[in-house]
Amino acid sequence: DIIKEYKPDLMLIHLATLDHTRHNYGLFNDEVDKALKMNDKWLGDIIQATKDAGTYKDTNFIILGDHGHLRVDKVINPNVLLKSNGFIKVENGEVKDFDAYVNSSGISAQIIVNNLDRLTELRELLEEFKEELFIENIFTKEEASNLGLEGDFEMVIEGLEGISFGNDFEGSIIKDSDIKDYKFAVATHGHLPTKGNRPPFIAFGPNIKGGVVIEEGDLR
């Protein structure tokens, strides 16, 4: 209706059904197939709306994904290790203060450091328990910046295949995946874009050159 009535110059639409479905059901299954068919129908409805509005021939369409997904078998909670080594202070089950804290981004996590005097000690601890924490990569702030990630953190860790990181600071370091939070669900994201299936980028319209295949892109 918006397209037909207002004929906007620019319209940005986020179809989140596939993302939600993969978080809850995994990468490839009947539910994912249903979500893909729903997305296909909605895209068809949008294209048809431009035809009904008489703007189809003047409209450029860009269809893209913002990330892929990887499966999650277990959730790893590095804050349990940090707490046991005095980096996190807890009272009555709540964090009262911390020298360092791991904040989950799914398959990666950002490490916020309040006490820079312990930064070297923290790095050594993570290196020592790298295998137990299922860490594949430890990036410094500068290395993360070179990859296009900025933020109020000192390090970023990325997990091995099949795990995501959690925020829990008590209990077991290793827990089962949990669909109550998308970061810890049976499939999630937060990994380097070189892993897994890469999101699509499809463009067509009067200002788009046809028949061109772009192997990869970089937004930096």
Describe each region flagged by the PLM.
Residues D58, G65-N114:
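Acidic/histidine-rich catalytic neighborhood
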Residues M38-L82, V156, F201:
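Metal-dependent active-site segment of extracytoplasmic phospho-/sulfohydrolases and closely related
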